[in-house]
Every structure is written in C-alpha cells, then in structure tokens.
C-alpha cells in the first residue's frame, strides 16, 4: 500500500506554552465581605492549564501509536476547554491512523470551522479524502495547502498531490508533483519510489535506475531502495549487478519481508 504522508508536522506539532500569573498568593489572600451568604452549590474549579497537559499527553501517546489512549486525552482536553482547533486536528489524526475516516473528517472539518486557514488540518483532510478514494476533494485540499507560501511542509503535500494524480493515471501531473517533492534539502523518500514506478510504466528503465540510485545516495539507511534496485536490475536482465543489492537487503534486515522477497529473487528462499 502506498503510504500517505499526512504532514509530518501534524504529528509533531509543538503546543504553545501557556504561562498563567495570579495576583493573589497564599500569604495575601483577597479580602472578602464578612456578611453571611445563602448556601449555594460550589462551582467546580477547572484549571485551564489541565487542558494543555492532556493535549501534550495525547501527543506523546499518538507518536507512540497508542491512538485509543491518545484520543481519551484529547477528548478530556476538549471537555475542559472546548473549541480548540489544534485539539480537533489531533483527534482527526488519531482516527485517520486507525482508518476511521468518517470520524477523522468530522474533526478536521471542526478544526477548519474554528480556524479556516489551519493548513495542517486542511492537508490532513486531503489525506483522508485520498484514503477514501475521493480524489477530486483531495486534490482541492492539497492545492489549497500549496497556495500557502509559508507552509514549511510543501514537499509532503506535493507527494500527497502526486499520489492523487497517480491514482487517476495522470502520470505527467503525478511526475511533476513528485519531482517537487524531491527538491533538496530534505526530499521525500517515497517520491523517488513513485517516480521510478512511473518511469518503469513508461518503459524508461534506465531513468528508473538513476532515480533509485539517487534515492540510495540520499537515504542509505532505507532497505527498500536496495530491494527496488535489485528487482529493477533483474528486470533489465542484469542478474550479476542485481545480486549484491539483494544480498545487502538480507544483510541489513534479515527478518523483514524485504529480505524474504530478496531471498526468493536470489533463489535462496
């Protein structure tokens, strides 16, 4: 399955620190009238900073893949301080990661109702539409995000837009978006794989090889690119050149699915 990049910034967003000052202290409490008052139900005291604490806890849990636990924290934060767009965006991300797309859309929509220019939420909503196969709506959101020249994660959005076009078999538009995603610095690894895929579909195997070699230079730690190079070289009939790449996959990640595939290709499975 082609992975979706739902803006890495969305999952690592720094929640703004809140500093509260109080003019009253334990040593000098505020004076109060001494006349007797009628008894009334005490009003629960809610610490507004507790909402931020829950959001931070939820973010950590979400980054650890504990989405149900993260949702509990975000929901508690929303109960204490409702109407926070960042909180709705985080809840939407949890649901997106769980494949619960309707719930994800609901929260991204709420985030955008609260803050219409919330670019992270719009990109995440686009990723949700893409996962649901609603390609036109996904394209609309991604194009809108790219219209924000201040957004620091445009490469990931270009990758998402490229996936949208690729699913429509619009190879030219997809290639253009993926090429924008690999512009240095910090190119998107998966964009290289998709570009190599397009080149192969067009019968341009030599160009696919160049793209994969560039990916391997930029991402030497990624086992998958060695596997893709080995597979491509086998397709080109260059068995002797393919073998070292496939052997490298097995050496780097012997217990992985990539290694199983490499062994099968080498005839050692």
What are these regions (language model features)?
Residues 28-45, 219, 223-269:
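Terminal, low-structured helical/coil segments at or just beyond the last alpha-helical repeat
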């Amino acid at each position: 399955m082609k992975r979706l990049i739902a803006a890495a910034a969305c999952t690592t967003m720094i929640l703004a620190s809140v500093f509260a000052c109080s003019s009253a202290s334990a040593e000098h409490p505020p004076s109060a009238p001494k006349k007797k008052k009628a008894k009334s139900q005490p009003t629960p005291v809610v610490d507004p900073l507790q909402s931020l604490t829950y959001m931070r806890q939820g973010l950590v849990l979400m980054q650890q893949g504990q989405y149900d636990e993260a949702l509990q924290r975000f929901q508690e934060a929303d109960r204490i301080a409702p109407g926070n767009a960042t909180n709705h965006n985080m809840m939407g991300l949890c649901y997106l990661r769980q494949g619960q797309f309707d719930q994800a859309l609901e929260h991204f929509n709420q985030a955008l109702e609260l803050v219409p220019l919330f670019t992270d939420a719009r990109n995440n909503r686009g990723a949700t539409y893409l996962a649901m196969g609603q390609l036109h709506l996904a394209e609309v959101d991604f194009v809108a995000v790219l219209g924000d020249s201040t957004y620091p994660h445009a490469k990931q959005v270009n990758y998402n837009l490229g996936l949208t076009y690729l699913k429509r078999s619009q190879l030219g538009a997809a290639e253009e978006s993926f090429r924008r995603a690999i512009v240095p610095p910090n190119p998107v690894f998966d964009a290289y794989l998709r570009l190599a895929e397009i080149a192969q579909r067009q019968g341009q195997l030599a160009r696919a090889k160049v793209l994969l070699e560039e990916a391997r230079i930029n991402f030497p730690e990624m086992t998958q690119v060695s596997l893709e190079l080995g597979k491509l070289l086998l397709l080109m009939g260059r068995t002797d050149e393919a073998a070292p790449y496939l052997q490298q996959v097995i050496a780097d990640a012997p217990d992985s699915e990539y290694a199983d595939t490499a062994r099968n290709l080498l005839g050692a499975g």
